[in-house]
Amino acid sequence: MNKIISFASDFGLSDGSVGVVKGVINRIDSDINIIDISHGIPPQNIKYGSLLLMRAIQYIPQGVLLAVVDPGVGSERKPIAIKTDWGVMIGPDNGLLNLACATVGGAQQAFALENENWIIPHEGCLLYTSPSPRDLAV
């Protein structure tokens, strides 16, 4: 069985954030195939990201959808996992996954991801501390 994670974010490609996520996935299981849906979602634009995922979910292989578009990244908001007939969707609990989930028939179960063993610490982590060019633009 193919192990596939389809990945979308608003990270952009100008820093190492996408590479860090893909590297962590690869360290956990080097046999996982990662499909990049988009990393050019406008920063923190949940509506845009949600519409993009709704359209994409119809064409990408079943498996895992990992999506990150979150104005509160690094906050106390917990990431969630949603089990569907299509597979599992992982992302912030901010509505980003709602349209994609509805498109594939709705949620069977949803869980807050709270196991600290699977969460990258914020201190010194590129995903939380490295400014991107869009953050530095005047």
Language-model segment annotations:
Residues Y128, P133-V138:
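Single conserved hydrophobic/aromatic residue that forms the stacking wall/gate
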Residues D15-I35:
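N-terminal glycine-rich anion-binding loops that anchor highly charged ligand groups
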Residues L13, V73, D135:
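Short, glycine/acidic-enriched loop or turn micro-motifs at the edges of active sites
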Residues S6-G16:
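N-terminal beta1-alpha1 ligand-phosphate binding loop
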Residues K3-I4, I28, N33-I34, G40-G49, ...:
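Active-site histidine-anchored catalytic micro-motif
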